Amino acid sequence: MAKADKATAVADIAEQFKEATATVVTEYRGLTVANLAQLRRSLGESATYTVAKNTLVKRAAAEAGIDGLDELFTGPTAIAFVQGEPVDAAKAIKAFAKEHKALVIKGGYMEGRALSIDEVNRIADLESREVLLAKLAGAMKGNLAKAAGLFNAPASQVARLAAALQEKKAAEEAA
């Protein structure tokens, strides 16, 4: 690879690091081209899966201000640069690794810090953002309904008391 090509590759990878909300570093030794294509399809639009030379990736990470990943860049390494929701991409990679034992998750990077294998797996086990928001909305709706009931209870009791007094007064006047 010519020096100019290397500089361009480093700049491209550094840009991907800067634009990514998270990255997942994997080892792909033993996967076929068809397997890699299948993994890229499973990631969809939320992430790009890139295979690059470790030396170029290390330089790009340093250029992008990413620290703590150098020890992950050994052997055949590929990186998933996540532009969307990190949970969705981590789920897709974990599911693919479960089916294809040749894919090994090495770690990742998110919100300014390196992630261990266990942390990437925990992110993959989280529910998606939409599901969590729906659960939160459901919990809030239930609590708001209870609060409304508590606030309306005294007013309805006063209304029932007034109606009972009115009926009693009407009954006394009729008698």
Curated annotation (Swiss-Prot):
The keyword Heme does not apply. GO terms for biological process: translation. SUPFAM superfamilies: Ribosomal protein L10-like. Keywords: Ribonucleoprotein, Ribosomal protein, RNA-binding, rRNA-binding. One of its GO terms (molecular function) is structural constituent of ribosome. InterPro entries: Ribosomal_uL10, Ribosomal_uL10-like_sf, Ribosomal_uL10_bac, Ribosomal_uL10_bac_type, Ribosomal_uL10_CS_bac. One of its GO terms (cellular component) is large ribosomal subunit. Pfam families: Ribosomal_L10. It comes from the Bacteria. The keyword Transferase does not apply. Forms part of the ribosomal stalk, playing a central role in the interaction of the ribosome with GTP-bound translation factors. Part of the ribosomal stalk of the 50S ribosomal subunit. The N-terminus interacts with L11 and the large rRNA to form the base of the stalk. The C-terminus forms an elongated spine to which L12 dimers bind in a sequential fashion forming a multimeric L10(L12)X complex. Belongs to the universal ribosomal protein uL10 family. This is Large ribosomal subunit protein uL10.
